[in-house]
Swiss-Prot record:
GO terms for cellular component: cytosol. Keywords: Amino-acid biosynthesis, Arginine biosynthesis, Cytoplasm, Lyase. NCBIfam families: argH, PRK12308.1. It catalyses: 2-(N(omega)-L-arginino)succinate = fumarate + L-arginine. It is found in: Cytoplasm. This is Argininosuccinate lyase. Pathway: Amino-acid biosynthesis; L-arginine biosynthesis; L-arginine from L-ornithine and carbamoyl phosphate: step 3/3. One of its GO terms (molecular function) is argininosuccinate lyase activity. HAMAP family: Arg_succ_lyase. Belongs to the lyase 1 family. Argininosuccinate lyase subfamily.
Length: 457
């Protein structure tokens, strides 16, 4: 059933209908459309369009339809309705007859779809926040279990300074906490109801839009009808949050893919999140992580696509805005799936402590400690940096770690070096000295774990 037609003397070309119809993707707004219609029916009672008895009849029919949709959502796609609004209204008329045709009084599909989409966004943000916090908790638990797993930290993919696997986990907890904050912040701005704004100029009925917003669970009603039906900032904000969040998950995946390689060998992934090769029997491929990394691109694309769609649109509603849904649905679905998958990867991951320790002892990751030692002896840092660089070259030439160079050889580079240098070059000393807030010392890592646990309770 089309919601328009009196103005037209010819039926739409079937090819145009297929091009124009949106039911194949906006069917996902069915529950929100029904909930919004119930609230609108209540508002129509307050302005005398519906009697209380008529409203009760409509609400009962809409609630039956809601349960039917939840039980068998696939029925929607069996229809040739133009969009979810047409489908819901058609089903309502099937149930209550002519009374169903009164429901759309004073309402436009413009404010209707804007309301539906905001309700869907609120529901989905709630799911994303839950999944985000679950992944944070999984990372904190993994950190707690691996506080003593010393491994190399990297810059430029070159071994730089020793860290712990726990410290690495906590870095991603910080990223996810910012993602959580972005979602909560976006939720505040989208939590305003556009229902009652009509096509663009507002409704002609003196409906209390604040009361209507409250019935739908919104914090308040929007202030400008023209903006309300044109606004898709919340779509951009959520796509932006998803794009940033997926960058974090992609980096997480890339790190673990590297840690899992035979060349690094720091971790072993569970069989539950890996797959084999159709040809090479020995292979155990990190497919879950590679898919997380790969799916990042499609989310970035959704954000870019939506910004390009909106950038040249005049006020108010334009059909271009129908393009807001597919990219948003896919991006937030993808982000949610990847959050769940990242948590599953951590469930069963094995950290290979001996190999991590061995790698941390290689690559002259304690060179900075030797420079700091020289500074403590009164050598300016820039000079100390040069001295240690020369010492590293000699250690490489001999195929030894710095701590294995005899004292007399170290003293060739600086006479201030003494026997007390050797304890400072140990891995544990490297960690212990990083005791400022946010550092990798065992005390700081333990405090960070406790803080994260308290925040996530």
């Amino acid at each position: 059933m089309a919601l328009w037609g009196g103005r037209f003397t010819q039926a739409a070309d079937q090819r145009f209908k297929q091009f124009n119809d949106s039911l194949r993707f906006d069917y996902r707004l069915a529950e929100q459309d029904i909930v919004g219609s119930v609230a609108w029916s209540k508002a129509l009672v307050t302005v005398g369009v519906l009697t209380a008895e008529e409203q009760a009849q409509l609400e009962e029919a809409l609630n039956v339809l809601l349960e039917d949709v939840r039980a068998r959502p696939q029925q929607i796609l069996e229809s040739d309705a133009e969009d979810i609004h047409s489908w819901v209204e058609g089903k309502l008329i099937d149930k209550v007859g002519q009374l169903g045709k009164k429901l759309h009084t004073g309402r436009s599909r413009n404010d209707q779809v804007a309301t539906d989409l905001k309700l869907w966004c609120k529901d989905t943000v709630s799911e994303l926040l839950t999944a985000n916090r679950q992944l944070q908790s999984a990372l904190v638990e993994t950190a707690q279990n691996n506080q003593d797993a010393v491994m190399p930290g990297y810059t430029h993919l070159q071994r730089a300074q020793p860290v712990t696997f726990a410290h690495w986990c906590l870095a991603y907890v910080e990223m996810l906490a910012r993602d959580e904050s972005r979602l909560q912040d976006a939720l505040k701005r989208l939590d305003v109801s556009p229902l009652g704004c009509g096509a663009l100029a507002g409704t002609a009925y003196e409906i209390d839009r604040e009361q209507l917003a409250g019935w739908l669970g919104f914090a308040s009603a929007t202030r400008n009808s023209l903006d309300s039906v044109s606004d898709r900032d919340h779509v951009l904000e959520l796509l932006s949050a998803a794009a940033i969040g997926m960058v974090h998950l992609s980096r997480f995946a890339e790190d673990l893919i590297f840690f899992n390689t035979g060349e690094a060998g720091f971790v072993e992934l569970s069989d539950r999140v890996t797959s084999g090769s159709s040809l090479m029997p020995q292979k155990k491929n990190p497919d879950a992580l590679e898919l997380i990394r790969g799916k990042c691109g499609r989310v970035q694309g959704a954000l870019t696509g939506m910004m390009m769609t909106l950038k040249g649109l005049p006020l108010a509603y334009n059909k271009d805005m129908q393009e807001d849904k597919e990219g948003l649905f896919d991006a937030l679905d993808t982000w949610l799936d990847c959050l769940h998958m990242a948590a599953l990867v951590l469930d069963g991951i094995q950290v290979k402590r001996p190999r991590c320790q061995e790698a941390a002892q290689q690559g002259y990751a304690n060179a900075t400690e030797l420079a700091d030692y020289l500074v403590a002896k009164g050598v300016p840092f820039r000079e100390a940096h040069h001295i240690v660089g020369e010492a590293v070259v000699e250690a490489i030439r001999q195929g030894k770690p710095l701590e294995d160079l005899p004292l007399d050889e170290l003293q060739k580079f600086s006479p201030v070096i003494d026997e007390d240098v050797y304890p400072i070059l140990s891995l544990q000393s490297c960690l212990d000295k990083r005791a400022a807030k946010g550092g990798v010392s065992p005390q700081q890592v333990a405090q960070a774990i406790a803080f994260a646990q308290a925040r996530l309770e």
